[in-house]
Amino acid sequence: MTRASRRHRVHRYTADGAVSARADTVAGEEPLEIRLGGRAFTVTMRTPGHDFDLVGGFLVSEGVVSAAEQVVRMDYRGGVDADGRRSYNVVDVVLAPGVVPPDTSMERHVYTSSSCGVCGTASIEAVTKVSAFGPAGDGVRLPVAGLLALPERLRAAQRLFDTTGGVHAAGLFRFPGDDDGPELLCVREDVGRHNAVDKVVGWALREGLLPLRGTVLQVSGRASFELVQKAHLAGIPALAAVSAPSALAVELAEQTGTTLVGFSRGASFNAYAGRDRIAG
């Protein structure tokens, strides 16, 4: 099986001129080809691990599936690495009868990089999708203290980041009660922030939890248009980020009724959209 991290020999240089050799741990990044019924659909760069969750979440974000029963099975297909070992870098998905596969306008003409999940889509229209779950009517209340606690809770769960310092994370939380702290439901890490989110959504798909009403998605980096879209398609009413959102992310959050929080650090955050859900 491919690995989420690998050891690599590095040379460390310091300001005083000293040079030392040591082993360092770096995050894994390998291609994953996604096939639908044996037909190539896309190739994405990802950190190996939770691949079926990644594929499931990706299909949700493409508007292909919205429930676990719409996926008959996922299997690793053939493929070997340079040493002749099985690579586990090809996943084939069999969709349930009646599930319409993506049309040609949605197919990826180039690979999907770990930093961009919509790069290579065949048309602008294919980027903006309609959710089966729209979160606009979700009346969940989000306590300020609870939202402020999310980045630290997410950081404490980042095991791969602890060893590599080179991956993004996405964590799904909920608040059981007004006076209760955040409950972590799932955390996933990946070199690509959109992959980490897909892995969380794919976990929820597999567990039969979609739509994800009453939850908050906390991410370790910035909030892009694509992350707001992925949250929207999974029925997640709130997205929080430790860094800034983009202008298009704010616009989409306003249009979809998604609560969007940015610069969530220390004792403050900014609410860019959907502040009516935030309870002081």
Predicted segments with their positions:
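Intrinsically disordered, low-complexity regions enriched in acidic/Ser/Thr/Pro/Gln residues
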Residues: 1-187, 191
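Feature captures the catalytic cores and cofactor-binding loops of soluble hydro-lyases/lyases
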Residues: 194-272, 277-280
